[in-house]
Swiss-Prot record:
Listed name of the protein: Large ribosomal subunit protein uL14
Presence of keyword Ribonucleoprotein: yes
Keyword Ribonucleoprotein tagged: yes
Keyword terms, alphabetized: Ribonucleoprotein, Ribosomal protein, RNA-binding, rRNA-binding
Pfam families the record matches: Ribosomal_L14 (PF00238)
Chain's role: Binds to 23S rRNA. Forms part of two intersubunit bridges in the 70S ribosome.
InterPro entries (UniProt xref): Ribosomal_uL14 (IPR000218), Ribosomal_uL14_bac-type (IPR005745), Ribosomal_uL14_CS (IPR019972), Ribosomal_uL14_sf (IPR036853)
Gene Ontology CC entries for this record: cytosolic large ribosomal subunit
Quaternary state and interactors: Part of the 50S ribosomal subunit. Forms a cluster with proteins L3 and L19. In the 70S ribosome, L14 and L19 interact and together make contacts with the 16S rRNA in bridges B5 and B8.
Length: 122
């Protein structure tokens, strides 16, 4: 469950290490974002020589959350950290590698490229 001012780790190789959520996309009254939702964020910490710089405004899709997510079969899934992947305007990832597991819900939300790059889909 991500909201404004939430900080997330980055699970790709764009050079960003941490982002801060500015806005949850999907309507003016939408407060929270879960796995597979798109947010607008600013880069708070970045590695030197990366594709993105500190202070840059980016779009990102959430791939892991600490808050559990309920699935259709009644099971719940949660992760150890809140993490996101930086995406372009056409919902393709900006990086070429994804680190750590991602949730199966991304496949239903049509983020196929992220699912195919991920080392593990849970």
């Amino acid at each position: 469950m991500i909201q404004q001012e939430s900080r997330l780790k980055i699970a790709d190789n764009t050079g960003a290490r941490e982002i801060l959520c500015i806005r949850v996309l999907g309507g003016s009254t939408r407060r929270f974002a879960g796995i597979g939702d798109v947010i607008v964020a600013t880069v708070k910490e970045a590695a030197p020589g990366g594709n993105v710089k500190s202070g840059e405004i980016v779009k990102a899709v959430i791939v892991r959350t600490k808050k559990e997510t309920r699935r259709a079969d009644g099971s719940y899934i949660s992760f150890d950290e809140n993490a996101a992947v930086i995406i372009k305007n056409d919902n393709e990832p900006r990086g070429t590698r994804i680190f750590g597991p991602v949730a199966r819900e991304l496949r239903e939300k049509k983020f196929m490229k992220i699912v195919s790059l991920a080392p593990e889909v849970i």
